[in-house]
Amino acid sequence: MDADFWLDRWREGKTGFHQDRVTPLLPKYWPRLALPTGARVLVPLAGKSLDMVWLAEQGHEVLGVELSSLAVQQFFAEQGWAPRRWESAYGQHYAANGVELICGDIFKLDDAALKDCLGVYDRAALVALPETMRRAYANHVYGQMPAGYRGLLLTLDYPQTQMEGPPFSVDEAEVQALFGEQAHLWDRRDILEKEPKFAERGVSRLDTLVFRLSAAS
């Protein structure tokens, strides 16, 4: 799986992974992180998620990273926002109303790009990557987050043999292996009845897991 896979999905309109509402678990659990107003929050593999709008409405400065220029342009167009634009070594930047989106590769971000991110919201990134890429992703992104960062990580847990991802199954054991003491399980919910597309593809069990991520300051 490479960048072209996701670029093709956006070009072909195969974006069933996009939600046309704010993820319900976000307003439920995000306040428990107690991030200060104005804190910069990283949203990796952001797509055109409305979760970014919600985070900005809470007073955060949102930094989203997304490969597809189509997704980025649709995000601002659908919000009716006219973004400022500029270019850097990380990619093309678009910014308006507290949301900055970098159209570029998350693996090109370095500690200079992430040093001001006190928070991270990962709903669609870790589960979008195959197992062979998840360790590299976690090391690259979370390994460069500043000391004392706090994050909310949402994953899915289902029998991977019953369905090809994405989204992929990332269970509690793998999250603990990737993040160690930085990860704390807050919640586990059975959501199979709410996700008929999974059942239609033969999935017999589907849980969503909610983790708090934090690094010692």
UniProtKB/Swiss-Prot annotation:
It catalyses: S-adenosyl-L-methionine + a thiopurine = S-adenosyl-L-homocysteine + a thiopurine S-methylether. Coiled coil: none annotated. Transmembrane segments: none annotated. Keywords: Cytoplasm, Methyltransferase, S-adenosyl-L-methionine, Transferase. It is an enzyme of class 2 (transferase). Belongs to the class I-like SAM-binding methyltransferase superfamily. TPMT family. This is Thiopurine S-methyltransferase. The gene is tpm.
